[in-house]
């Protein structure tokens, strides 16, 4: 909600551009550059007429005519200040800010005390972003007004001028001073919705939300149809997590100003904060239709798409954001994370490294970069980054846990175990450290400790078929056959198609003397192994077929898909790939039949 120096003249300021219209133009006693055949008197009379015509046109808001006439003045008598000052004011009204600045600077060089020229030049500076220069002139104007007030009736800056003064102060980081000026403007014109809105914006920039919200509510009391008031109030309420009211206000902003891309973007943010990414995505897309260059809308849409699993679209949008704003570290970090989630750690690492360099105390930046290094199997780099993160936050659960995993991958169990034990202490409700500790203790032959950690992990998180199978295998090694059988049966209940649990249970049952049940489990396990091997062969054949399709070798691809289905008739991916290949050959009926088989298999999948 920053106050922006837009390249437009706010309506509030339109009355500030003063044109001095003298009864007679000031004749020059200096030699002019007019044509030699004309007398100085004739030149001055023509300049006087042009000045009168120009200022008269300006008074009627005919600024194009005023510009033409006043250009004649400065051409005929370039050393007369009034011509430059009046032309500068007109150019300012026309939005020709660089040209206005040139004329107004010339006017002040000729007559430094011209308050109208000073005022208009300050406004022109503000409109072009030269806020430091604008502030210097505003300060001078204000000081001169105070000096005159000592002897004459009190003189204060107009509300419109205070408005522009405050905007320039805010742009130079002087928010306290800007707020004071804007409060003065509001006091002078308490029924101005524009001024209350600007004051509320300044409070929002300082995160003084209660005062900001009060000002925005006053804006809407004065003018219930003020779109900016609804927008800014909604954004302030969003910052305070008052989501239902924020959504209401931002919806009103969009109704009052349906072409306002910023309102659509803020409404999308409110929906996202309310965990409604479907509506958020609709609003961000609407914002981009209204303003395809909106970097904020692009960035927010990318994040929403990322949350809903559309990572490829998110990456494409974030690349556009980073290209538009190379210095936007947040967007770069988001792109790095999106690339990481897409499995492209190689491209992610430069963005994540840059983020960490810019925010060395950011724990999440350490976690993300370490994860990218792990994805690239650069385990030493991951360990280095995680240890660096712990120097900034030594009690961080995730850093200790991730470091334990990285050290485990280095087969450094002695170093990994203390990190995982620390993680378990930091977050007693997390099952992952206990499970990993159980695996490490089992690898080291420390079976009692392994059983303790694994059983604790399974109590905390029982929906883990692999965990029950591992615990069952451990109990078998410890000769705790009843416990082993119970754990393995639970593994089979959760994942009945996994062969290893059946085969291990068969061994346990045989050792218990239950030969008949052992034989049944062994037979089931062997059958599942055969199915698993067939599925693996089908996957290889299907992948080969996909490669052939990319090369345009459709007939050969069909052979590979059919080979895959001979190995595993229930492999839906092979049916779907075969359907696409048959369709390429124009065999639509056969293609549709294969596609139906794929649909049925996918629907029947648990």
Description of each model-found segment:
Residues 76, 110, 144, 188, ...:
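Structural marker of alpha-solenoid helical repeat scaffolds
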Residues 60-72, 93-106, 128-145, 170-184, ...:
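Structural signature of tandem alpha-helical TPR/SEL1-like repeats
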């Amino acid at each position: 909600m920053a106050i922006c120096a837009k390249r437009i003249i706010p309506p509030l300021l339109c009355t500030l551009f003063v044109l001095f219209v003298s009864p007679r133009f000031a004749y020059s006693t200096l030699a002019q550059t007019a044509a030699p055949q004309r007398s100085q008197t004739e030149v001055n009379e023509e300049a006087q007429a042009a000045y009168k015509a120009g200022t008269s046109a300006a008074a009627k808001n005919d600024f194009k005519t005023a510009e033409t006439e006043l250009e004649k003045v400065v051409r005929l008598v370039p050393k007369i200040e009034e011509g430059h000052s009046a032309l500068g004011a007109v150019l300012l009204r026309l939005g020709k800010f660089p040209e206005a600045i040139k004329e107004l600077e010339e006017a002040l060089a000729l007559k430094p005390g011209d308050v109208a020229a000073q005022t208009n030049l300050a406004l022109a500076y503000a409109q072009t972003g030269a806020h430091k220069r604008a502030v210097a002139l505003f300060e001078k104007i204000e000081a001169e007004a105070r000096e005159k007030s000592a002897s004459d009736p009190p003189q204060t800056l107009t509300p419109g001028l205070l408005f522009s003064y405050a905007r320039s102060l805010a742009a130079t980081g002087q928010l306290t001073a800007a707020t004071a000026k804007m409060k003065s403007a509001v006091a002078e014109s308490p029924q101005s919705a524009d001024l209350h809105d600007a004051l509320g914006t300044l409070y929002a920039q300082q995160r003084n939300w209660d005062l900001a919200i009060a000002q925005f509510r006053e804006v809407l009391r004065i003018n219930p149809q003020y779109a900016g008031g609804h927008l800014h109030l909604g954004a302030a309420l969003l910052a305070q997590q008052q989501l239902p009211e924020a959504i209401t206000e931002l919806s009103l902003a969009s109704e009052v100003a349906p072409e306002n891309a910023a309102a659509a973007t803020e409404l999308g943010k409110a929906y996202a904060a309310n965990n409604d990414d479907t509506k958020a995505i609709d609003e961000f897309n609407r914002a981009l239709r209204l303003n395809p260059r909106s970097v904020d809308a692009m960035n927010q849409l990318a994040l929403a798409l990322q949350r809903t699993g559309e990572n490829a679209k998110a990456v494409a949008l974030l690349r556009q954001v980073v290209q538009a704003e190379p210095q936007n570290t947040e967007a770069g970090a988001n792109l790095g994370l999106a690339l990481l989630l897409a499995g492209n750690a190689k491209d992610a690492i430069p963005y994540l490294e840059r983020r960490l360099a810019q925010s060395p105390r950011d724990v999440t930046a350490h976690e993300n970069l370490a994860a990218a290094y792990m994805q690239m199997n650069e385990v030493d780099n991951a360990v280095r980054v995680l240890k660096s993160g712990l120097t900034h936050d030594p009690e961080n659960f995730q850093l200790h846990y991730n470091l334990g995993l990285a050290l485990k991958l280095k087969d450094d169990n002695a170093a990994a175990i203390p990190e995982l034990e620390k993680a378990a202490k930091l977050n007693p409700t997390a099952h992952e450290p206990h499970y990993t500790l159980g695996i490490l203790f089992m690898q080291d032959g420390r079976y009692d400790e392994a059983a303790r950690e694994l059983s604790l992990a399974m109590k905390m998180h029982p929906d883990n078929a692999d965990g029950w199978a591992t615990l069952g295998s451990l109990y078998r090694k410890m000769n705790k056959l009843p416990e082993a059988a119970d754990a393995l049966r639970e593994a089979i209940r959760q994942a009945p198609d996994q062969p290893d649990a059946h085969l291990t249970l068969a061994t346990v049952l045989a050792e218990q003397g239950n030969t008949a049940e052992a034989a049944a489990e062994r037979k089931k396990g062997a059958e599942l192994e055969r199915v698993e091997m067939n599925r693996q062969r089908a996957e290889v054949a299907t992948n080969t077929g996909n490669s052939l399709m990319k090369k345009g070798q459709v007939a050969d691809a069909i052979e590979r898909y059919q080979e895959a289905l001979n190995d595993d008739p229930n492999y839906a991916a092979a049916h779907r790939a075969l359907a696409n290949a048959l369709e390429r050959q124009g065999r639509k009926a056969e293609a549709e039949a294969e596609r139906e088989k794929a649909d049925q298999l996918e629907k029947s999948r648990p």
